[in-house]
Amino acid sequence: MPRYRKLQKGEIMIMLYKILTALVCLAVMVLAPIFVKEQRGGPCWRSLFVKMVAATGYMAAGGLCVAMTGVCSPFDKWMLLGLFGSWIGDLFLHLWQTKVFPAIGFLGFLSAHFFFIAAYWTGIRAMAPDRAFFTWPEIAFVALFDVFFVIFAVKTGLNLKGVIAVPIVIYATVITTMLCKAAVLGITAVQTGAAHGAFVLICALAGALLFVASDFTISILMFNEKQKKNYPLKMFNIVTYFAAELLLAFLIALI
């Protein structure tokens, strides 16, 4: 007869946290398409409720990942701030009562990207203390990405004339920097033999790439009049966005 070891209280709690995290993630991804359906006729209180429940879900996933490890490291704190910045962005970007709200939402997402960059850099320095913040290949990549974004904006007919063009280009630069740091974090984790290195690479890079895909599509939805009611594009945008947030939340349990 096989003998089974009795699980300790700590092990049971970790298992419970993992189950709860899986259920939360499932709920978020189920709510994502429901949100798109609810706001098909335009933003409303019901669509806002669904969106914010889903957004609270990725915040909860981050908190559960902290509970799994039992430690809230500097990396974890930056990541939680990033998730909270995204939550603020989700809230205000969807409010429609005044034009000030979308601007606050934009700043919320911009701050979230800065927090994620700070988290990645904290993780990188913990594994490779001598690494420079930027290397020349990274600078070249960011510059080329900005050029690509300008070409993309022209080709897709984005209305970025006037003052709005400056913050959008800044945002593109920041999210490209986040993508760079995510890649470096994952590669450094693998190179240094860090625990869960391969999973860190997958979650960090996939999360950042999905974030970029989501931001590209939302720029089309917001600044191209012909695409504002493109339902499949809206679905792609919101699914990639929430998937990105969840993948980034998972990093808290891995680093």
Question: Predicted regions: what is each one?
Answer:
Residues 1-14:
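Short, Lys/Arg-enriched N-terminal segments with co-localized hydrophobic residues
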Residues 14-255:
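Polytopic alpha-helical membrane-helix bundles and their juxtamembrane interface segments
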